[in-house]
Amino acid sequence: MIGLNHQFLLKNLVSKMKISKDDIKKYLPHRKPFLFIDEVVNIDKNNEIHARKMITSNEYFLEGHFPGNPIFPGVIIIEALGQASGILGFVTMDKTPEEGSIYVLAGVDKVRFRKRVRPGDTIDIYSKVLGEKKGIWKFDCRAELNNELVCSAIILCADRKVT
């Protein structure tokens, strides 16, 4: 099990922090059409982020997933969990991608999908730091729709230098 071995845990934050839509781009190098975090509701001192993704009928991949019965793809939900975890990692370490670092998806464990997500839905995304070891961060993640579990997963992100 990865254990926390640093005293960096949100040292500069008060009990809650909200990140504006523009500031999301300071913490994530992703851009449209591959930016899947629309809002960061809060990041708290317990090392947890609450973010949101609003699903619109304009999502480019819904045309083919599935014609006449659009369902937001599970792999994109996993990506959104990873992006929320990346924001949390950057905030926790008090740095941004501009400083030459990036969080890349290193693994996904224990994935379960429980409910379909469709255009018009808004999913709430939660990620909590479980630990860090040698630059590999472990997060306990879930996505919810109307307070019902949509997806759960353990996400691993690697903190790497941009080359």
Task: Name every feature range the model reports, one short phrase each.
Residues 2-5, 13-16, 29, 45-46, ...:
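HotDog/MaoC-like acyl-thioester-processing domains
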Residues 9, 16-18, 86-124, 150, ...:
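Hydrophobic beta-strand-centered segment that forms part of the acyl-chain substrate-binding groove
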Residues 25, 68, 113-115:
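Beta-strand-rich interaction surfaces with strong enrichment in secreted/lumenal proteins
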Residues 32-72:
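Catalytic strand-loop segment that frames the active site of acyl-thioester-processing enzymes
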Residues 38-42, 110, 152:
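Extracellular/lumenal ectodomain signal focusing on beta-strand-rich modules
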Residues 40, 72-97:
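Active-site helix/loop of acyl-thioester processing domains in fatty-acid/polyketide metabolism
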